[in-house]
From Swiss-Prot:
NCBIfam families: ureG. One of its GO terms (molecular function) is nickel cation binding. Belongs to the SIMIBI class G3E GTPase family. UreG subfamily. This is Urease accessory protein UreG. GO terms for biological process: urea catabolic process. Facilitates the functional incorporation of the urease nickel metallocenter. This process requires GTP hydrolysis, probably effectuated by UreG. CDD domains: UreG (cd05540). GTP binds at residues 11-18. It comes from the Bacteria. It is found in: Cytoplasm. It comes from Ureaplasma parvum serovar 3 (strain ATCC 700970). Coiled coil: none annotated. The gene is ureG. Homodimer. UreD, UreF and UreG form a complex that acts as a GTP-hydrolysis-dependent molecular chaperone, activating the urease apoprotein by helping to assemble the nickel containing metallocenter of UreC. The UreE protein probably delivers the nickel.
Length: 206
């Protein structure tokens, strides 16, 4: 059995990780892909519960992992709990093509082990401050795709999205990034297309 394409989704608490997965699975479900999602929380399975209530994915395609302690460790140094959750999900669904793995909320420094995920997405929101892209952080710099979410809030928090874009280019060079408002699906298609391009290449290799 070939492993599905695994996309890691990281970012600070409240940036929109769970909503991104909910919106992406809803959009990509219209293309007929076989998908699943695994969420990480420190002491609860709250994000998994949210997906169960909002996602188009059936309940048996959503799993929650309680990492305990530091959420960074569960996606990098000791990812054994997530490897086990992925294996269990793949055993239940041998047809799985795409799996989203959501990290616990962090402080800009979390990165996924390359053994755990094929590609990583890091998402922030403008309410966390215009300076975030300027500050960098390993999660933002090393991710394959960077997303600036909740751009609709920029006028209310005094953030200049154009400045954030310019700072992102300085921090990430020519690596991909998008701006989104997931509440209205603004920018969602760009993110979905980015994923689908990589998924199609992976499927061709089967």
């Amino acid at each position: 059995m070939k492993r599905p394409l695994i996309i890691g989704v990281g970012g600070p608490v409240g940036a929109g990780k769970t909503m991104l997965i909910e919106r992406l699975t809803r959009y990509l479900s219209t293309k007929g892909y076989s998908m699943a999602a695994i969420t990480n929380d420190i002491y609860t399975k709250e994000d998994a519960r949210i997906l169960l209530n909002t996602s188009v994915l059936p309940a048996d395609r959503i799993a929650g992992v309680e990492t305990g302690g530091c959420p960074h460790t569960a996606i990098r140094e000791d990812a054994s709990m997530n490897f086990a959750a992925i294996e269990e999900m793949c055993d239940k669904h041998p047809d799985l093509q795409l799996l989203f793995l959501e990290s616990g909320g962090d402080n800009l420094s979390a990165t996924f082990s390359p053994d755990l995920v094929d590609f990583s997405i890091y998402i922030i929101d403008v309410a966390q401050g215009e300076k975030i892209p300027r500050k960098g952080g390993q999660g933002m710099i090393k991710s394959d795709l960077f997303i600036i979410n909740k751009v609709d809030l920029a006028p209310y928090v005094g953030a200049n999205v154009e400045v954030m874009k310019a700072d992102t280019l300085k921090s990430r060079g020519n690596k991909d990034f998008f701006v989104t408002n997931l509440k209205t699906d603004e920018g969602l298609k760009s993110v979905a297309d980015w994923i689908e391009k990589r998924l199609q290449l992976a499927l061709l290799e089967e």
